[in-house]
């Protein structure tokens, strides 16, 4: 693709991934024309919404599924290092947006919050202690604390310790104070507003992309429908970026590119218990993750989270899975069935055969009553009362199912997946956690994979936004500490000030 002074790019969806990519693109190529189309009436209504995302501030500080017990008994923390670095990269970009004036008032979307891991039982306690020792030895996590003392835990997680005094059992906890809670809905709204203000960008709500056709010159003709009037129009563009969350797979299929063929999706809703009693909410001030039950997928890790929503402190426990055919919370009951094609049906069937435990888990979760959910909560908070908690359905995640040389047909991919056409004109983001927390790294991956001819030109611009770009926070301890101190200042977190 030959370079020119100006290109057109269509961004589908006004969630955190599209707005992150758009915010980055308008800074490195201010002359490009950005067209954002969102089918709903405002940004961040689906999975990016603060009431819909399952967890926030994923930095591998407390999420035990990022540190894996090996057959020899050791703990592999490599994935935790990567996730932590990616979150540090996100914080740098957000800090840049604040410093440049693109967004304001960072404490409206990010707040300091301790991250705590909590386990019960002899084997889990051994795992947590071994994890602590492995992480403590690495500079990224050397501020981690560990205890098996119930008196210390009463100070860290007083609400969870209530009712355990007579029979505490075997338990342990680890803590890193320098964690965060991120309101991705508010962050997304701020970035969307900033994109709207850009002279070469348009953000149109109630506009749904319904079809694609690639022209002979390599450009794409994108058909857009105004959902209020029913009128359709065509937008010609050089690039198409599909950041539409659960709606990405059907849109990718409509492009007809070969890379869309052996892909499918398995939609899962998250359900949470939300506390309605302010007196209970005030007694918990942390993000506390447990360990997933044996034989269940990583999405099942239970956590009791302090979250800041609409400027108010809230308390959520979950997730509980709720399977249904919709790919989006505001989608159609036909979404799943329409996504089944002749070219991916064997992929989907293979996934069903290979993942019977996941299917059983999902079915068990669907039939679980509120009382069943409350019983799970009481393993964290023994004195939880039914009247203080309300069960609600969060957003949709669509687990990517694909064929791979390594795993064969029907492999379920956890995490975020970037799919692009061979000519790099179509880019789609599929999947889920830790998507939002690592959204900036995902945007960088999109840029590097799909715009290689701009790499040299863009590198200094990216480094201005993300000072660690091109360097490793995992390998360079001095740089890592410098970056953390700077982002804490930029985002008004109050860490590392001594």
From Swiss-Prot:
Its cofactor is FAD. It is an enzyme of class 1 (oxidoreductase). It catalyses: (S)-malate + a quinone = a quinol + oxaloacetate. It holds the Pfam family Mqo. It comes from the Bacteria. The gene is mqo2. The keyword DNA repair does not apply. Belongs to the MQO family. InterPro entries: FAD/NAD-bd_sf (IPR036188), MQO (IPR006231). Keywords: FAD, Flavoprotein, Oxidoreductase, Tricarboxylic acid cycle. Pathway: Carbohydrate metabolism; tricarboxylic acid cycle; oxaloacetate from (S)-malate (quinone route): step 1/1. The keyword Lipid metabolism does not apply. This is Probable malate:quinone oxidoreductase 2. Its EC number is 1.1.5.4. GO terms for biological process: tricarboxylic acid cycle. GO terms for molecular function: 2-hydroxyglutarate dehydrogenase activity; L-malate dehydrogenase (quinone) activity.
